Amino acid sequence: MLHNIRIVLVETSHTGNIGSTARAMKTMGLSNLYLVNPLHKPDAQAIALSAGASDIIGNASVVDNLDQALAGCSLVVGTSARSRTLPWPMLEPRECGVKSIQEAAQAPVALLFGRERVGLTNDELQKCHFHVQIPANHEYSSLNLAMAVQILAYEVRVAWLDSQRQDATVQEASVYPVAEDLERFYQHLEQVLSGTGFIRRAHPGLVMNKLRRLFNRARPESQELNILRGMLTSIEHTQKPETPAPDTGHGRPQA
């Protein structure tokens, strides 16, 4: 399960934070590190601060954009240090650990951490099923990147250890769509709603954001998402004007 947990750092500016993150991961048994467009590639400082976890850095996946880091993931959780304009389904760190381990039994899970100064953008957070907020001291809530990773990595490990102690029960596991399938669904949904005039194609605005929040909260399974895609396709077909049958001349009265 733990190998299916991805720690995703977005546009990290200090290489030392990459090293400290690798150390935090390895102490909790995590090994899958993704670096999204880091401002600087891992260097000697990163290796030094990894304190023996240089293998995590050496095996890290360096990608150009967030979609590449989320490819194949059925659950995406983004860290957020502040309240946003559009509320999103929230998890406590402990809930995040439990849900991550439950999902990681079937498919990769991504835990997203943003830039040191400004965190994740709204667009990046909208790609998440849930947000997680660490309940730090309101008077001094300054956690550095590696500290935040350490806290969530610890909760993941606690949940994993609990799962090992529980009696194994055979249950039919739910299969959830991966991130890119959800993105294709949202694109299809926006296209159909624009075609019906429900939203303006040039300015989808908050409507699509709210629909993303709705479906992320509902967590449709893969089969359910296929049904929704089928419904959208059916709507598209009803919008297309029927092509009149070609006139073959049959049935005309003879002169």
Swiss-Prot record:
This is tRNA (cytidine/uridine-2'-O-)-methyltransferase TrmJ. Its main location: cytoplasm. The keyword Nucleotidyltransferase does not apply. It comes from the Bacteria. It comes from Sodalis glossinidius (strain morsitans). Pfam families: SpoU_methylase. Homodimer. Belongs to the class IV-like SAM-binding methyltransferase superfamily. RNA methyltransferase TrmH family. Coiled coil: none annotated.
